[in-house]
Design a protein with these regions (language model features):
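Hydrophobic transmembrane alpha-helices
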Residues: 1-72, 76
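Alpha-helical transmembrane segments and their lipid-water interface positions
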Residues: 27, 31, 78-86, 121, ...
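Extracellular/periplasmic helix-loop-helix junctions in multi-pass membrane proteins
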Residues: 32, 161-180
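Short aromatic-rich membrane-water interface segments that cap or initiate transmembrane helices
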Residues: 39, 43, 99-113, 180-181
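Membrane-interface interhelical connector segments
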Residues: 84-107
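Internal alpha-helical transmembrane segments of multi-pass membrane proteins
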Residues: 135-154
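Pore-lining and gate-forming transmembrane alpha-helices of multi-pass membrane transport proteins
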Residues: 148, 176-189
Length: 226
C-alpha cells in the first residue's frame, strides 16, 4: 500500500530547510536597525520556528522531529561544502577569495555552536508546543505558539552566543546581544501570528490532519518513528 505524501507538509519542510540555510549565510552580515545592532540572519531565522510551530501543531512532534533532523543534515551538508570550497585553491586571477572565505569559511567553533543551538532550540520549541496542546486540549494556539517560540529561541541564544563568542566578546555585551535577539525574535513571532493562525487553519482543512501526541516517545533520536 502506497503511503500518501502530504503536499503542505512537503512544502513546509522545504521552506524550513531553505530558511535555515539562508539564515546561516545571512548571519555573516551585521546590520543596524533603529540603532539596534543584530545579524541579518534575524530576517529569516524566526520563520523556521514559525514553521516548526505549524508542523508540530498539525502533524505532531514526530513529524517535527523528522523536519528538524533534515534541517540539521542539510545545514551540515552546506557547511561542509563551503569549507571544502574554501580549502580549494582559488584561481590566480580571481580577487573575490577573501569575501567568499568570509561567508563560507566559518570557524569550527561557530559551526558547532550554531548547529547545537539549532537542535536544542528547535526540539524544545516542538516539545513545548506538543505538550501544551495536550494540556490545553488543542485550545489557545496563539499562547502555545508564543511560549514555545520564547523557550526555543531563549535556549538557542543561550547556547549559540557563549559557544561562538565567549572569550572574544565581553560577557556583558554578550548578555545584551542575547537579550536583544530573544526579544526581537519573540516580537517577530507575535507580529506574524495572525498569518500563522490562518496558515494552520488552512492546512488542517486541506490536509485533514490535527495530531495529538498521546503516548508517543519524545526521544530526539527516534527518527524512524514518524
Amino acid at each position: 500500500m502506497k503511503q500518501k505524501v502530504s503536499v503542505p507538509f512537503m512544502l513546509l519542510g522545504i521552506l524550513f530547510n531553505v530558511c535555515l540555510i539562508a539564515a546561516n549565510l545571512l548571519e555573516t552580515k551585521v546590520i543596524q536597525v533603529f540603532g539596534i545592532t543584530v545579524t541579518a540572519g534575524l530576517l529569516v531565522f524566526p520563520i523556521s520556528y514559525i514553521i516548526n510551530d505549524c508542523i508540530a501543531e498539525v502533524w505532531g512532534f514526530r513529524k517535527a522531529r523528522l523536519i528538524i533532523w533534515s534541517g540539521f543534515a542539510m545545514n551540515f551538508f552546506v557547511v561542509m561544502l563551503g569549507l571544502i570550497a574554501v580549502a580549494l585553491p582559488a584561481a590566480p586571477f580571481w580577487d573575490g577569495a577573501a569575501h567568499f572565505n568570509f561567508v563560507f569559511g566559518m570557524a569550527p567553533r561557530i559551526v558547532i555552536a550554531s548547529l547545537t543551538a539549532f537542535l536544542v532550540g528547535s526540539f524544545l520549541n516542538a516539545y513545548v508546543m506538543s505538550r501544551m496542546k495536550l494540556a490545553s486540549n488543542g485550545r489557545n494556539f496563539s499562547a502555545r505558539a508564543i511560549w514555545s517560540t520564547v523557550v526555543g529561541e531563549t535556549a538557542d541564544s543561550l547556547i549559540f552566543f557563549p559557544g561562538a563568542f565567549g572569550g572574544i566578546i565581553a560577557w556583558r555585551e554578550l548578555l545584551v546581544m542575547m537579550c536583544i535577539q530573544i526579544l526581537l525574535k519573540s516580537m517577530y513571532e507575535v507580529l506574524i501570528l495572525p498569518v500563522t493562525i490562518r496558515v494552520v487553519k488552512a492546512i488542517k482543512r486541506i490536509d485533514g490532519s490535527d495530531v495529538y501526541d498521546e503516548g508517543i516517545s519524545y526521544k530526539v533520536w527516534k527518527i524512524g518513528d514518524i
